[in-house]
Amino acid sequence: MSIILGIDPGSRVTGYGVIRQNGRHLQYLGSGCIRTSEKDLPGRLKQIYAGVTEIITQFQPDVFAIEQVFMAKNADSALKLGQARGAAIVSAVNHDLPVYEYAARLIKQAVVGTGGADKAQVQHMVQHMLKLPAKPQADAADALGVAICHANTNKTLIALAGQATSAKRGRYR
């Protein structure tokens, strides 16, 4: 049994989702968004770090999973996204959590069944898979998708290994 924290990073809105994996069963524990209010990027990064730290303290996850940087429409957006990811990852590493990264297409594949799924499809499937009474916010649904992707990837690796061992830890550990 493990608690997985999934993060969908963003410099303005960072989604988070927390699930408990017990064998094949996934249980929803919580989700939401860290909304930054600072105008300058360093202030927003500080808010992301503090928000992720608060979530880690509240839920005590065993694993931290985050979406990889995708190629944004412009370099400035990609850099800001990378910095937001960095703030979240530093919080995880400071709490001695193993860090795993997943590409957006792999996350969508794990949740919806196709890497080209849109946000509405991800929201619908996350609601269905976790038996939620309502659709989660888009960024929170994406973060729950990251956590679900890790849970499914971890289950597959355990099955392939033929024993109950964890997947290789991320490079940030």
Curated annotation (Swiss-Prot):
Catalytic reaction list? Endonucleolytic cleavage at a junction such as a reciprocal single-stranded crossover between two homologous DNA duplexes (Holliday junction)
Keywords of the record, alphabetical order, are: Cytoplasm, DNA damage, DNA recombination, DNA repair, DNA-binding, Endonuclease, Hydrolase, Magnesium, Metal-binding, Nuclease
Q: Does the keyword Zinc-finger apply?
A: no
> Which residue positions are annotated as catalytic?
D8, E67, D139
State the InterPro entries in the record: RNaseH-like_sf (IPR012337), RNaseH_sf (IPR036397), X-over_junc_endoDNase_Mg_BS (IPR020563), X-over_junc_endoDNase_RuvC (IPR002176)
Recorded superkingdom: Bacteria
Where does it primarily localize? cytoplasm
PANTHER family according to UniProt: CROSSOVER JUNCTION ENDODEOXYRIBONUCLEASE RUVC (PTHR30194:SF3)
The UniProt family comment states: Belongs to the RuvC family.
Describe its function.
The RuvA-RuvB-RuvC complex processes Holliday junction (HJ) DNA during genetic recombination and DNA repair. Endonuclease that resolves HJ intermediates. Cleaves cruciform DNA by making single-stranded nicks across the HJ at symmetrical positions within the homologous arms, yielding a 5'-phosphate and a 3'-hydroxyl group; requires a central core of homology in the junction. The consensus cleavage sequence is 5'-(A/T)TT(C/G)-3'. Cleavage occurs on the 3'-side of the TT dinucleotide at the point of strand exchange.
**What protein name is recorded for this chain?**
Crossover junction endodeoxyribonuclease RuvC
Q: Which organism is it from?
A: Vibrio vulnificus (strain YJ016)
